[in-house]
Every structure is written in structure tokens, then in C-alpha cells.
């Protein structure tokens, strides 16, 4: 039986999901889990279809914040569900608010930063804007470019097929179930498709207001980070992405690893997916799930991702992924990329942290500076992590957490990362940093190295030592040499 892991000591039984596969092989596959063949056409086909029901933006008003002009627009991104879906919705017309901040010194033709945000436009008490909006005026003033925030991606709460009103993961999980059960009739039923169209339509609305804007950087958190990925992979106006807490890729391998890490239990964050039987599909697979992943899983877009600059922000105490999840997909990603893991941070990252990460990335990207280059190695014999870089480092810190009882480093577990300085050995302009975990410590250790430069902060992906699951089976963690930067 599968189970949902509620916290460090409590679990509840859930639906049966078969036998998990415990061997985590290097690069891209796990025993019996060959990656799904790519299907890059489904998203593009949906975007083409949805555009027919898109409506132009309407200016709602204009204000000034410390010299920055902020315009508010409303627009309709699409009608969903439509053709290619048997879903029924109580609110098929997707409506949005778009905030656009324009600094006085903005240069014509400069790129636009678009942050995809949430909120609830169908809440019982009326529309509710995102609880923690991005400080777009402050970012626009500091960067000298237009910065926008898209509200209501997805539209919610929604009643799908007469079900009780749902939002966020409840909507995604139900829409996935439909898509998996009828891969052809419901090929456009995944909620991520209209979310992606919402971002694409927002770029159209921005260009209608700023005809000289031709390039975009997209960002968003969690499923909106997923949206940033899919929009960036399918719309060439997007030149860079900054996805936040979107540690999902190589989905079957990644989340089988999550399941085994928690002693063959699912974290409570995945409860909606467990209720809809999707966790069982992760472990056992099915033609319908494979068809879904062909266009949902970004590892299936190697050519498209190579042109995107990627700064991926993750949480060391994430509620969905485990700290070393990234090793299941990072070797499969192409093109320029850097990482930043936030210590002692859950899946729910505040707008101030997001804004600071965006400020650093955009400042460097606008200046034409490549992302810091580094080589990262993990030694599977003793857990040693080694980093070589020529990027000037102002401060280097090791973040180390120990759990004597469980392979669990979620913030909710009570385990905290401790900071300690780490010195590099430098020769001919290249510095090497190393850390080896103490094998005498009981339980498990999670660790990563953070590098703070003059204008940019980046980290290694975390490792966990020792290489075993709670049931004693080995975890030959795929830690091949990673080349970051570019």
C-alpha cells in the first residue's frame, strides 16, 4: 500500500500503488522507467487553438509609484476547456489582470520581465489578488526595464465536471487524471496548457502596449514555474527563465526517488495526486501517463531548452521534492543554467526572496555577462562534493543538515541547515572547494555549497549521504560531473 507522509511521525494509508523500484540509475532512467518519447507538438497545437478565443487587453487604470508608472489591464487569455477536452467547467472564459511597471528611463527595445502569479478570481468573496505580489515597481526602477505581473494563472476556484470547487493542485491532479484516462479525447485537458496560454497571451498584451518589446524573461513559482518552462520552450520571444521551486523534472524517476526516500510513503504535498491515482502511475506507469509526460516533462525538449538561459531557484526544505531530486534531471538539461538553493526554506518562497533572485539574474543578464561557470562533482564512494570555478567568490558557505532518524529534510520536519565557512584552494585563477560528510554520524546528512559573488549568488545542487533508503536499499545517486554556467 502507498501512504501519504503527513509529518515526521504520522502517516495515513492511501490507495494501493504496486511495487516501487528502488534503483536510481545515472543520467535519465531507472530500472523499468525509460523516459517517455518526446511530444513537443501538443503544447504548440494547444496554443494555436487557444489563440482564437483570446481577447485584447483593456486598460483599467494607471498610477505612479516612486516615479514608476504602473498600468493595470484586464484581458481574456482563452476559453478552456474547448476542443480536445471532454472536461466541463463552470467558468470556461479565463480572465486575468496584468500589472505593468514602466520606469521613466526605460530604453526602447529593452526586454521585459514577466512574473506569472496566482490569486483567485472566482473566490466566494470576490476576486482575490495574489497574497504576496512581486514588487514590480521597485524592480523596474532598479533594473531600468519594464516588469510585469500576471494574475490568476490558473483561473480558480473552478468546478470541473461538477466536482466541488477546486484550486491549485486539486485542479492540476483532476485534469491530469482526465488526460491520462483518455489521451486522445482529452489531449488538451491538462491545466498546465491553459496556464501556458495565459503567459503567452500576457506577452501579447504587453507587446500591444509596448510595440518595441521583443524579448521576455519569464518567472513564476511552483506550477507557475512549470508554466514559465513550457511557455519558454514553446515561444521564441522568451530568452531566459527563472523558475522558482519547480524541482519536478524527469518526473517518474524523480518522484519514485521521493517515495523511496520517505520509506515508501508520499509527502502530504502530493495528496491531491494520490487521491486521483497519479502516484500509482508514477511507480507503475501507464500508456496514458506516458502520453502526458511526453509534453509535460521539460526533459523532453532538449533542442528548445538549449537556447534558454536558466536560473533555477529551489528550496532546500521543499515539500514536494527531496534535496537531491535535481540529480535526476540536471544531467539531461541543455544550455546555459545556474542554480540557487535557499537554505531552511519550504516550497512557499516569499516575494522578497524571489525579487532579489530576479534582480541579481536580470542585472547580470542585461549587462551581457554569462552565468558563473563551474564544474561540480559528487564522489559516490564517500559523498564528497567538489566544485571548481574561475568565478570570483566573495563568500563561500557550506550548508549542512543532519537527520539521525529519517531521510527527511523538509522544513516541516524540524531539521535545519547549519552554515559554516568553507575555504577554496586556488591556483592559476581557478579555485576548488570540497566537503566530505562525516561517515560516523548517524542517519542522513544533506549538504550544498553556496557561492556569493559581487553581483550574483549560486549554489551546487544538494547531495545526501549515505547512499541508502530507509529500507536499507542502496541509492547510487547519479552525481556525474555537472557543468554549470554559460
Language-model features: locations:
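Short beta-strand element of the alpha/beta-hydrolase
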Residues: 109-119
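Gly/Ser-rich "nucleophile elbow"/oxyanion-hole loop immediately N-terminal to the catalytic nucleophile
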Residues: 181-197, 201-222
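Cap/lid segment of the alpha/beta-hydrolase catalytic domain
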Residues: 121-123, 128, 137, 145-197, ...
Amino acid at each position: 500500500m502507498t501512504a501519504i507522509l503527513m509529518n515526521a511521525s504520522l502517516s495515513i494509508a492511501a490507495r494501493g500503488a504496486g511495487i516501487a523500484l528502488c534503483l536510481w540509475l545515472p543520467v535519465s532512467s531507472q530500472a523499468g522507467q525509460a523516459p517517455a518519447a518526446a511530444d513537443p507538438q501538443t503544447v504548440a497545437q494547444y496554443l494555436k487553438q487557444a489563440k482564437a478565443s483570446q481577447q485584447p487587453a483593456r486598460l483599467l487604470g494607471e498610477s505612479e509609484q516612486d516615479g514608476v508608472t504602473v498600468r493595470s489591464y484586464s484581458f481574456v487569455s482563452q476559453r478552456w476547456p474547448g476542443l480536445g477536452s471532454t472536461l466541463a467547467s463552470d467558468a470556461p472564459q479565463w480572465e486575468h489582470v496584468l500589472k505593468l511597471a514602466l520606469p521613466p528611463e526605460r530604453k526602447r527595445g529593452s526586454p521585459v520581465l514577466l512574473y506569472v502569479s496566482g490569486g483567485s478570481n472566482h473566490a466566494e468573496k470576490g476576486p482575490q489578488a495574489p497574497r504576496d505580489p512581486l514588487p514590480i515597481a521597485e524592480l523596474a526602477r532598479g533594473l531600468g526595464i519594464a516588469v510585469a505581473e500576471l494574475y490568476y494563472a490558473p483561473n480558480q476556484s473552478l468546478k470541473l465536471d461538477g466536482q466541488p470547487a477546486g484550486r491549485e493542485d486539486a485542479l492540476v491532479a483532476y485534469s491530469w487524471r482526465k488526460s491520462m484516462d483518455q489521451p486522445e479525447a482529452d489531449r488538451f485537458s491538462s491545466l498546465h496548457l491553459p496556464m501556458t496560454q495565459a503567459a503567452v497571451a500576457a506577452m501579447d498584451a504587453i507587446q500591444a502596449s509596448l510595440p518595441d518589446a521583443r524579448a521576455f524573461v519569464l518567472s513564476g513559482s511552483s506550477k507557475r514555474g512549470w508554466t514559465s518552462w513550457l511557455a519558454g520552450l514553446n515561444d521564441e520571444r522568451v530568452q531566459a527563465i527563472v523558475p522558482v521551486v519547480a524541482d519536478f523534472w524527469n518526473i517518474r524517476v524523480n518522484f519514485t526517488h521521493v517515495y523511496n526516500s520517505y520509506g515508501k510513503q508520499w509527502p502530504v504535498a502530493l495528496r491531491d495526486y494520490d487521491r486521483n491515482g497519479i502516484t500509482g502511475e508514477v511507480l507503475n506507469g501507464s500508456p496514458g501517463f506516458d502520453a502526458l509526460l511526453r509534453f509535460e516533462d521539460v526533459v523532453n525538449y532538449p533542442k528548445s531548452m538549449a537556447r534558454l538561459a536558466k536560473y533555477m531557484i529551489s528550496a532546500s526544505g521543499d515539500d514536494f521534492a527531496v534535496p537531491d531530486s535535481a540529480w535526476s534531471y540536471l544531467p539531461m538539461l541543455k544550455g546555459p543554467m545556474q542554480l540557487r538553493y535557499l537554505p531552511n526554506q519550504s516550497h512557499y518562497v516569499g516575494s522578497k526572496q524571489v525579487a532579489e533572485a530576479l534582480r541579481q539574474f536580470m542585472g547580470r543578464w542585461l549587462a551581457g555577462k554569462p552565468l558563473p561557470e563551474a564544474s561540480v562533482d559528487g564522489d559516490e564512494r564517500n559523498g564528497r562534493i567538489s566544485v571548481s570555478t574561475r568565478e570570483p567568490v566573495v563568500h563561500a558557505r557550506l550548508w549542512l543538515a543532519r537527520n539521525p532518524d529519517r531521510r527527511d529534510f523538509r522544513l516541516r520536519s524540524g531539521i535545519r541547515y547549519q552554515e559554516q565557512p568553507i575555504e577554496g584552494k586556488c591556483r592559476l585563477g581557478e579555485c576548488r572547494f570540497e566537503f566530505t560528510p562525516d561517515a560516523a554520524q548517524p542517519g542522513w546528512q544533506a549538504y550544498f555549497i553556496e557561492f556569493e559573488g559581487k553581483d550574483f549568488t549560486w549554489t551546487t545542487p544538494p547531495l545526501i549521504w549515505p547512499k541508502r533508503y530507509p529500507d536499507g536499499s542502496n541509492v547510487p545517486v547519479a552525481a556525474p560531473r555537472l557543468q554549470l554556467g554559460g
